[in-house]
A protein has these predicted regions:
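Short glycine-rich anion-binding loops that position phosphate/pyrophosphate groups of nucleotides
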Residues: 7-9, 100-103, 140-141
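An acidic, phosphate/nucleotide-engaging active-site surface
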Residues: 51-128
Length: 252
């Protein structure tokens, strides 16, 4: 699978990728590899300073793919062609987006504050052109995958919904309180179906360790826009309680 993540926060005091997304994406990658599959983590150059070094403690170097931004356009097109070749060579059949912003009706990606962030965002929704089975995980309405519900579940429901709602659908969509929780739910589903090999990644202690690594490399809480080991403004106890509850459900 190709597992795509990275949501850049350009208006922070220290601009960087947020903590929601990379943690869940790494969990999904590790789980897929544990059950005998393979996974490549995909992001873009603005998010790379956080995501690449965080991932390299868990994945081989050639399994972390960083896209250039769309300008100059030729650079992204060449990168995309390389991924197309990789998908054919490695028989990749699934594309998973976890907290990855996508284009709204105006063709541009917007953050939850309604700001156009095209300048800092590679057009990774174009990976859907590969024709793979697609899964989207999101929490705010502006993520790739939300095109399945944008007409009736986003506009008028979230702030700036009419401007930020992503129009790109995926075959399956997971909507969660945080996208990391949605990714964790996917791995919990693997466990519930009998894949005990994913057990190490279900533990809150493993999640805490990965979150600390992401923050060490500059990851930001997406709500507070600060370099702290929290996700979407949630207190750690509340955040990891949900992780533990999902894990317990998968093992029951």
């Amino acid at each position: 699978a190709l597992v795509v993540t990275g949501f850049y926060i350009p208006k922070a005091a220290q601009p960087a990728a947020e903590t929601d997304g990379p943690l869940g994406a790494l969990e999904v990658c590790m789980a897929l590899r544990a059950i005998g599959g393979d996974a490549w983590l995909v992001s873009d150059e603005c998010c790379a300073p956080v995501i690449r070094p965080s991932a390299l403690g868990f994945l081989p170097d050639d399994h972390v793919l960083i896209a250039p931004n769309a300008n100059p356009k030729g650079g992204f097109d060449a990168w995309l062609n390389g991924v197309i070749d990789l998908a054919k060579t490695e028989h990749i059949d699934t594309l998973v987006y976890i907290e990855r912003v996508g284009p709204a009706r105006d063709g541009s990606p917007h953050n939850m504050r309604g700001i156009d962030i095209t300048e800092w965002t590679a057009p990774l929704s174009q990976l859907t052109l590969l024709g793979l089975h697609t899964i989207g995980v999101g929490d705010g309405g502006n993520e790739i995958g939300m095109g399945r519900v944008e007409d009736y579940a986003i506009e008028g429901v979230v702030d700036h919904g009419e401007n930020i709602a992503c129009t790109v659908p995926t075959d399956q969509l997971v909507v969660a309180g945080t996208s990391n929780w949605g990714a964790h739910a996917l791995v919990c589903a693997m466990r519930a179906l009998g894949s005990n090999a994913v057990d190490p990644y279900l533990e809150p202690t493993w999640q805490e360790r990965v979150l600390d690594v992401i923050v060490e490399y500059g990851g930001l809480d997406g709500v507070h826009m600060t370099n702290v080991a929290t996700v979407d403004g949630l207190e750690p106890d509340r955040y990891f309680k949900q992780v533990g509850q999902l894990t317990d459900c998968a093992r029951s």
